[in-house]
A protein has these predicted regions:
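Conserved catalytic core of the tyrosine transesterase superfamily
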Residues: 1-362
Length: 362
């Protein structure tokens, strides 16, 4: 039997390997709560999706079967293990439409909590169901696919929330001097985390990396000689992202100061960013830290680490006008994702286009 925290050579897993293992184990637990035939779909999905995507799809599909047991008289006395593929093709498009209606507000089975879904949530759950049905239809296990006869929920584009140039400076200045207004325990905590927080904020704003990529960084991933960090992207690919002098200064200040003075707990020795508990910082801790500071500087904007990524993408696009460069640096696999987010922002560019073409010399 294999020890899941160590490889055969007894070498500890890095953050990304460990997180894949944890998610795979979690997926197995979720699959136990789905109809047995669903395992085939998730096995087929494995080569082309991350464990996190499969977990999200498993939760979404579980909601669908709970809906059938709660709302469809045919399945009122069913338990999860009674469902068969033929039950999928016995449903009509109207059943799928009722499910979409149900998703807008429903009670979660485990704890009775009220769950609501907006456009994005509805689209994701419908996408999961279509993919699930599509697998059994493609393999001719079912002859009908009612999900294809139901329109996907319409997604409206939302304006990108980001920090303006002056707000970026205000945020960093605020973190640097926030201690001036603190005393006692709050001041001690601030002093302990100040350089780390400035390093994280400067890194997120200066490279546009994702928060999950940021917390996954190890000390060895930082290369000051070339001013680059090796990040593990969403799909597991590694890429070097380059940073400027401001980021280098903030990272160096943190690493040679607080980070070197820390004694990390066992298993966290390699982590670049440590919590006050001397463990690798988690995604939520970074999110809370960003919100804590941003709320003081831009109370009317809900700023998260992802908004810092949008801020970087916006600045880079405005400086270079090169959407392909922005897509590459942000690690977007499809340039259309980038276009959708950033091409709409540059109103000035479109205004210039209006006066660039002269019809008649005046």
């Amino acid at each position: 039997s294999t020890n899941l925290t160590n490889t055969a050579s007894n070498k500890p897993h890095n953050y990304h390997e460990q997180s894949q293992i944890d998610q795979t184990l979690r997926l197995r637990e979720v699959l136990k709560t789905l109809p047995p035939f669903a395992k085939d779909y998730f096995r087929a999905m494995e080569p082309k999706s991350s464990a996190r995507t499969r977990i999200n799809y498993a939760y979404d599909i579980r909601v669908f079967f709970h809906f059938l047991m709660e709302n469809n008289p045919v399945y009122k006395n069913y338990t999860m293990d009674r469902f068969m593929p033929r039950d999928l093709e016995n449903l009509e498009p109207v059943d799928i439409e009722e499910y979409l209606e149900y998703l807008k507000v429903y009670k979660r089975d485990e704890d009775g909590e009220l769950i609501t879904n907006g456009e994005k949530g509805l689209a994701r759950k419908m996408s999961a169901l279509r993919s699930f049905y599509g697998y059994y239809f493609k393999h001719q296990i079912i002859q009908k696919n009612p999900t294809l006869l139901v329109d996907m929920p319409k997604l409206h584009d939302k304006a990108i929330i980001r920090l303006d140039t002056d707000e970026v400076a205000l945020l960093l200045d605020f973190v640097e001097s926030a201690g001036d207004h603190l005393t006692g325990q709050a001041l001690n905590y601030y002093k302990k985390t100040r350089d780390r927080d400035i390093a994280i904020l400067t890194l997120l704003l200066g490279t546009g990396i994702r928060v999950s990529e940021c917390v996954g960084l190890d000390l060895k991933d930082v290369d000051f000689k070339n001013n680059g960090i090796t990040v593990t992207r969403k799909g597991g690919n590694q890429m070097v992202v380059y940073f400027g002098d401001e980021v280098a200064g903030a990272l160096e200040n943190y690493i040679t100061g607080d980070r070197e003075a820390s004694t990390p707990l066992s298993g966290h020795e390699q982590a670049l960013f440590l919590s006050t508990q001397r463990k690798r910082m988690g995604v939520q801790a970074v999110e809370n830290m960003v919100k804590k500071y941003a709320r003081q500087v831009t109370p009317n904007k809900k700023i998260t680490p992802h908004k810092l990524r949008s801020t970087y993408g916006t600045s880079l696009y405005k400086e270079t006008g090169d959407i392909y460069l922005v897509a590459d640096v942000l690690g977007h696999k499809d340039v259309n994702t980038t276009k959708k987010h950033y091409a709409a922002i540059d109103d000035n560019r479109r205004r210039k286009a209006a006066s660039a073409v002269k019809l008649r010399e005046l």
